[in-house]
């Protein structure tokens, strides 16, 4: 059985003081991690206090990006090795904002996935199509190509442990949500792609999230779908009550 995973992606929000307040507000009210895994991915400047404040609670921690080199003359980057030393569990890579604003390529994302695994951090690999790709009805081939490129050279064992987040770019921060059926259809396509690349067992183990205007009002319906194992949540993860409503969707 795949354990559901709800991960908040704070993007460029929250300072260390706000992070401490947020974690203190949620940490006693999170579900048992065997029922639902609760994750907050925060800006690098907040990670130390996020981890420290979350200690002893059911809150898992994530970074929003990392580089594929562990150290050296790479001004402004985040080391996957240091994330591991800090005890950070997850790292989001390949988010559409990173691909769009910062021109990250599929090759960069593949290198990052390998670097994270080499340093004991679990990647959350994002994929998803733009509005024009969907309107041209090319979303399947687009996302399949992203998955193939991102997973290139990873072992079946690695892939069964990572998380894939499907985030249709047209539904991020636009208030438009893919219908639960549209989301399920793409998450199923992703699972079938993993099966084609590896095997059925790997495809059954990999957790696939939907990301794109996930909120308390639609989380139950999305999570009822067989191939959706979680949510990668933006705005709705910034408020403690809203985040708690998401992770406790089973109640």
Curated annotation (Swiss-Prot):
GO terms for cellular component: cytosol. It comes from Lactobacillus johnsonii (strain CNCM I-12250 / La1 / NCC 533). Keywords: Cytoplasm, Gluconeogenesis, Glycolysis, Isomerase. The gene is tpiA. Its main location: cytoplasm. Homodimer. It is found in: Cytoplasm. Pathway: Carbohydrate biosynthesis; gluconeogenesis; Carbohydrate degradation; glycolysis; D-glyceraldehyde 3-phosphate from glycerone phosphate: step 1/1. The lineage of its organism: Bacteria, Bacillati, Bacillota, Bacilli, Lactobacillales. This is Triosephosphate isomerase. Substrate binds at residues 9-11, 173, 213, 234-235. GO terms for biological process: gluconeogenesis; glyceraldehyde-3-phosphate biosynthetic process; glycerol catabolic process; glycolytic process. GO terms for molecular function: triose-phosphate isomerase activity.
């Amino acid at each position: 059985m795949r354990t559901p995973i709800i991960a908040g992606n704070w993007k460029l929000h929250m300072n260390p003081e706000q992070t401490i307040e947020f974690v203190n507000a949620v940490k006693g009210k999170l579900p048992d991690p065997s029922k639902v895994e609760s994750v907050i991915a925060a800006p690098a400047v907040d990670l130390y206090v996020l981890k420290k404040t979350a200690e002893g609670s059911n809150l898992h921690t994530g970074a929003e990006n990392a580089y594929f080199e562990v150290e050296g003359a790479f001004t402004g980057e985040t080391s996957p090795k240091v994330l591991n030393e800090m005890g950070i569990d997850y790292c989001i890579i390949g988010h559409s904002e990173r691909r769009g604003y910062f021109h990250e390529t599929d090759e960069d994302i593949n290198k990052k996935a390998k670097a994270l695994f080499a340093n004991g951090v679990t990647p959350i690999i994002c994929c998803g199509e733009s509005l024009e790709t969907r309107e041209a009805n090319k979303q399947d081939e687009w996302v399949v190509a992203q998955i193939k490129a991102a997973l290139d050279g990873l072992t079946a064992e690695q892939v069964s442990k990572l998380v894939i987040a499907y985030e249709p770019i047209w539904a991020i921060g636009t208030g438009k949500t893919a219908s639960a059926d549209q989301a399920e259809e793409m998450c199923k396509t992703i699972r079938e792609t993993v099966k084609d690349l590896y095997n059925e067992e790997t495809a059954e183990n990999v957790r696939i999230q939907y990301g794109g205007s996930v909120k308390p009002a639609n989380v139950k319906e999305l999570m009822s779908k067989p191939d959706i194992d979680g949510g990668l949540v933006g705005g709705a993860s910034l408020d403690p009550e809203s985040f708690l409503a998401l992770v406790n969707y089973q109640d």
